[in-house]
Amino acid sequence: MNLVDVIIPTYRPDNKFLVSIKRLLAQTVAPGKIIIINTDKAVWDRTGIEEKLKELFEESDTKLILEHIEKQDFDHGATRNFGVSKSKAEYFVCMTQDAVCFDKKTIEYLLRGMDKSIKMTYARQVPDKNANKIEKFTREFNYPAESMIKSFNERQTLGIKTYFASNVCAAYERETFDALGRFDTGQILNEDMLFAYKLIENGYFVKYEAWAKVIHSHNYTGVTQFKRNFDIGASQASNPHIFKNIKSESEGKKMVFKTMEHLLATHSYISAIRLIYISACKYAGFLAGKNYKKLPKGVVRAFSMNREFWR
């Protein structure tokens, strides 16, 4: 039995994805399998990426498992559960196609963070060299250099961040994952955070493992930020048992103020003006998402980053 496998959902992967695979194959703790669940085979075939992908595995002991699903069948939780079903490893790591291991020890550090109580670890996200100033500081704010173990006792001090975790790069112990019912399905996003909630509510711990690093960032436009935060708001509105008594707005305000302070201190005045615009887009999207049930279906689809979800 393999110690660890890696599951990656893909949609129109590019050359950056090939770089991610190269880094995974070079890990000190090599995955037994890399399981790719791709959406839209027709697009995949047109890119010719499969031939390049198979070449990377020719000299590796890691096995490539490739499955295709239709676009209408994609579901953040169910698709990853499908990937996990192809694994028999003791642990598995979920990644996104645009996350690249920072060094050869990303998986090693994720697994080193596990113990009898810690059943999920997630990696630090460091910005790409092309990330703008706002995105760089945001990553540093959300993914600091110090590791942290989170449990039920931290709810009063950490608030919403108690349950924060990211499948951009996260490791899970399979036995506990199965015992707690796997990822929730039918969710627009936040399958990682919802599972972290289940762990913590059942007495387990989640660890932010700062030594495990992946390169991952986005220079989103204001419109894209609106759409993404609409989906976040909709996710929270759909899970009141988690989010009703824990507010996330205060953490968002704290991040905006800290970012503004940093931009002004570094004389990045144009970025400071842009931060106001981006933050307004985020908050407007979040509020709209929290109230999605009051909006017409056509408006919801227009506001959402994941239009297929609302079909």
Where are the regions a protein language model picked out?
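Short beta-strand/loop segment that forms part of the nucleotide-sugar
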Residues: 32-42, 67-69
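Short, flexible, basic/aromatic active-site loop/helix in glycosyltransferases
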Residues: 141-162
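Acidic donor-binding loop at a coil-to-helix junction in glycosyltransferase catalytic cores
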Residues: 189-195
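Short aromatic/hydrophobic "clamp" motif used to bind/position activated sugar donors
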Residues: 92
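Conserved donor NDP-sugar-binding/catalytic core segment of glycosyltransferases
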Residues: 104-136
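Glycine-rich, basic loop-to-helix element that forms the pyrophosphate-binding segment
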Residues: 70-87
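Short, well-formed alpha-helical segments that are part of the catalytic scaffolds
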Residues: 13-26
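Non-catalytic, C-terminal membrane-associated alpha-helical segments of glycosyltransferases
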Residues: 231-234, 238, 245-311
